UniProtKB/Swiss-Prot annotation:
The protein, known as: ATP-dependent 6-phosphofructokinase
GO terms for biological process, alphabetical: canonical glycolysis; fructose 1,6-bisphosphate metabolic process; fructose 6-phosphate metabolic process
UniProt-listed Gene3D superfamilies: 3.40.50.450, Phosphofructokinase domain
Essential cofactor(s): Mg(2+)
Binding residues annotated for Mg(2+), in chain numbering: D103
GO cellular component, one term: 6-phosphofructokinase complex
Chief place of localization: cytoplasm
GO MF annotations, alphabetized: 6-phosphofructokinase activity; AMP binding; ATP binding; fructose-6-phosphate binding; identical protein binding; metal ion binding; monosaccharide binding
Pathway(s) served: Carbohydrate degradation; glycolysis; D-glyceraldehyde 3-phosphate and glycerone phosphate from D-glucose: step 3/4
EC supergroup of this enzyme: transferase
The species this protein was found in: Listeria monocytogenes serotype 4a (strain HCC23)
Active site: D127
Lineage: Bacteria, Bacillati, Bacillota, Bacilli, Bacillales
Amino acid sequence: MKRIAILTSGGDAPGMNAATRAVVRKAIYEGLEVYGINYGFLGLVNGDIRKLELGSVGDLLHRGGTFLYSARYPEFATEEGQLKGIEQLKKHQIDGLVVIGGDGSYHGAEALTKRGFPTIGIPGTIDNDISGTDFTIGFDTALNTVLDALDKIRDTATSHERTFIIEVMGRDAGDIALWSGLAGGAEAIIVPEESFNMDDVVDRLNKGRERGKKHSIIVVAEGVMSGNEFAKQLAEYGDYHARVTVLGHVQRGGSPTAFDRVLASRLGARSVELLLEKRGGLAVGIRENRIVENDISEILKEKHTLDQKLFDLASILSI
């Protein structure tokens, strides 16, 4: 193996640049040439490929987003799209590929693997919804962004004796809501994986009022319903006219935390090692602080599950 390439795909996540930096520098250290593919699989099909040097990834470690840019390209699910991608890889004499992204990116990596092209997947998504790893790149940073907002909102909630609803990202996975809600002491956490009853939510808030608590925070994952819809339903069940804060895309931005930088560096370096070992078709991850790798097809078959014990703990501590 003499040349490898790297791309980022799907929603950006803080730490993608740190992972790219690790891949480039580890590969060059091992004597490989490295190419960056702009705009994900769209750029691959269009041949938007450039050579990367050590200096290309200087000053990247602390930057959020992805300097390789990202784009969604559903056409890569077609045979035509995949063959065009492989044609471009062969044209540039690239021997292996590293893909950083979430579930959709993994499907693209799997497709290339099935067509005989060595590909490694790195989990990069703030949702933390990829199986085979305890944490995905970007989750910790997003979590801290939400927690910072939650702490500030609690200040004003306390001052005005109000209920606030914070809507966070998480279409199918509630990890951001769960972890931020637990860390921020939310009175209720609403996630896609757990059914909820508005009567129970109101009962919990009422019990807090009886103890003298005059403010409350509810964290709602967007996949359940919008924060505004939740506020509307809450008002129908009790005397709770809540203010709503939708954090939106601020959760994707910002300088990555130390944890995300270290995680990205470890996963990026291991990806290069796997390609040198001629072990394509794998996804790297972290389990109990150890770097692991799993068959990417098996990862896609598994459904990410919410930490039930953590959810139960959050419920106990929010009493």
